[in-house]
Amino acid sequence: MVILGPPAVGKMTVGRAICATSDFRLFHNHHVIEPLREVFDFGTPPFQTLCHEFRRRVMEEAAATGTRLVFTVTLRVDVADHVAALASWVEPFSSAGLPVSFVQLSADLDVRLLRNRTEGRLEAKPSKRDLAWSDANVREWAQYRTNTDPDLPSAADDLVAAYPCLSLDNSSLTAEEAAARILAWL
């Protein structure tokens, strides 16, 4: 299962809630980002290369062992390179005949700015602890498309349409409520 959405929408937190009541394992975006930041500056070529390769290898091993993953990531659905990376991460599962699904979370900006400061987020994501920068990043990403929309074509449309997809506004839902809805949908 791939959970998409803007920063601070609750992807990791909802993913944790899904894993707490199912046999899924969580592989959230910052499982890769935080260790690599210790060695390479964010966004540099070696950082980007290793980030992509590590995600891909985790997906390959999970698919080979039948491990059900919740993978969370923020990316731009209108940028072909982002979509190509996403396709490469789900490919090991689809090639093995294993189920792939997408969940697209959305929440109002004011909700995401509040969630940006939660203890669980800051504990798991040291790069978000500079709150002035992190809040600005959440606001910046508000201008980008992080989920598909049937009324606005994007580079991700074909990929997402190839698998079951749930779009869920979790502005007023707890992580547990969102997880319950997602698991019921599955």
Please provide the spans of the model-predicted regions.
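Short hydrophobic/aromatic beta-strand immediately N-terminal to the Walker A/P-loop
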Residues: 1-2
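Switch/connector loops and helix/strand junctions flanking conserved nucleotide-binding motifs
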Residues: 109-116
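Glycine-rich phosphate-binding loop used to anchor ATP phosphates in small-molecule kinases
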Residues: 50-109
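Small-molecule kinase domains that catalyze NTP-dependent phosphoryl transfer to phosphate-bearing small molecules
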Residues: 118-176
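P-loop (Walker A) phosphate-binding loop of NTP-binding proteins
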Residues: 6
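Conserved substrate/cofactor phosphate-moiety recognition/catalytic segment
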Residues: 13-63
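Conserved glycine(s) of the Walker
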Residues: 10
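Short, amphipathic alpha-helical "lid/cap" segments that border enzyme active or binding sites
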Residues: 55, 59, 175-183
